[in-house]
C-alpha cells in the first residue's frame, strides 16, 4: 500500500507539471490540461485516498480469510521440541475455536465495510455477498458444535470444517469456499475502484485530428 501511495503522489506531481494554467482563472486546487479540461485535484485526491483506504481494509479481510487455510494445516498436529510437528490426532477443539474466532472477526470487519457510505453499487453488492458468505461460514461452524466444539474434535471433522482441499466438506468447507470466492471478488472490485480513481488523473488528452479538407 505504501508503494501505491507513493505512485499516486508521483502521478499527482506529473499531472500538475503537465497541465497549464492558461485559459479561465482556476481555483487553488484546480489545474487545466492542454485541451482545456479542468481537474479538481483536491476532489480527485480525496477519491483516491478513500478508495485506497477501503481497499486496504478489504485486504485485511482477505488475509484473515486466507489464514483459515494456515490453521487447517495444523489439524492433528502438535509442536515438537525441535520446532517441527508431530502427530496428535483427535485433539482439534482449540484449533477449531480459533478458526471460529477468526470467522467472527471477518464478520465484524465486513459489517463495518458494509456500513460505509458512498460505496458504488458494484462494491456494495460485493461487500454484501462477502458478508453473507462470512456469516454462513461462522453459522455452519456453530451449527456443527456437537462435533467441532469439543476438545476431542476428530481430524476428519476438523478437515471437513476447514480444509478446502478435503473431499468431505459438510462441516464448513463448502461455506468457506464460497467465502473465499466472495472475498476474492471483493478485493478485485476494491482495487478496481482505486485504479479508476487514478485514471481520472492519467486519462490522455484528446487531440483532434487535423481536417483532411484543403
Curated annotation (Swiss-Prot):
Name this polypeptide is given: Variable small protein 1
GO cellular component annotations of the record: cell outer membrane
Additional free-text comment from the UniProt record: Genes for both Vlp and Vsp families are on (usually) unnamed linear plasmids in B.hermsii HS1.
One Pfam family linked to the record: Lipoprotein_6
Its job: The Vlp and Vsp proteins are antigenically distinct proteins, only one vlp or vsp gene is transcriptionally active at any one time. Switching between these genes is a mechanism of host immune response evasion.
Signal peptide: 1-18
Gene3D superfamilies: Lipoprotein, type 6 (1.20.120.240)
Lineage, opening ranks: Bacteria, Pseudomonadati, Spirochaetota, Spirochaetia, Spirochaetales
Keyword set includes Signal: yes
Membrane topology value: Lipid-anchor
Key words, A-Z: Cell outer membrane, Lipoprotein, Membrane, Palmitate, Plasmid, Signal
Amino acid at each position: 500500500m505504501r508503494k501505491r501511495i507513493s505512485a499516486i503522489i508521483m502521478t499527482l506531481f506529473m499531472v500538475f507539471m503537465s497541465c497549464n494554467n492558461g485559459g479561465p482563472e482556476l481555483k487553488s486546487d484546480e489545474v487545466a490540461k492542454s485541451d482545456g479540461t479542468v481537474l479538481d485535484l483536491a476532489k480527485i485526491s480525496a477519491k483516491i485516498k478513500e478508495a485506497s483506504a477501503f481497499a486496504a481494509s478489504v485486504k485485511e479481510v482477505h488475509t484473515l480469510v486466507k489464514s483459515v487455510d494456515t490453521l487447517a494445516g495444523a489439524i492433528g498436529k502438535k509442536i515438537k521440541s525441535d520446532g517441527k510437528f508431530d502427530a496428535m490426532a483427535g485433539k482439534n477443539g482449540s484449533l477449531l475455536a480459533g478458526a471460529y474466532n477468526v470467522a467472527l472477526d471477518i464478520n465484524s470487519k465486513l459489517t463495518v465495510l458494509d456500513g460505509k457510505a458512498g460505496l458504488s453499487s458494484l462494491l456494495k453488492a460485493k461487500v454484501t455477498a462477502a458478508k453473507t458468505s462470512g456469516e454462513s461460514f461462522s453459522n455452519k461452524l456453530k451449527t456443527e458444535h456437537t462435533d467441532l466444539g469439543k476438545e476431542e474434535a476428530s481430524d476428519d471433522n476438523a478437515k471437513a470444517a476447514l480444509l478446502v482441499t478435503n473431499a468431505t466438506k459438510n462441516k464448513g468447507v463448502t461455506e468457506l469456499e464460497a467465502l473465499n470466492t466472495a472475498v476474492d471478488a471483493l478485493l478485485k472490485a476494491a482495487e478496481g475502484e482505486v485504479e479508476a480513481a487514478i485514471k481520472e488523473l492519467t486519462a490522455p488528452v484528446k487531440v483532434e485530428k487535423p481536417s483532411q479538407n484543403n
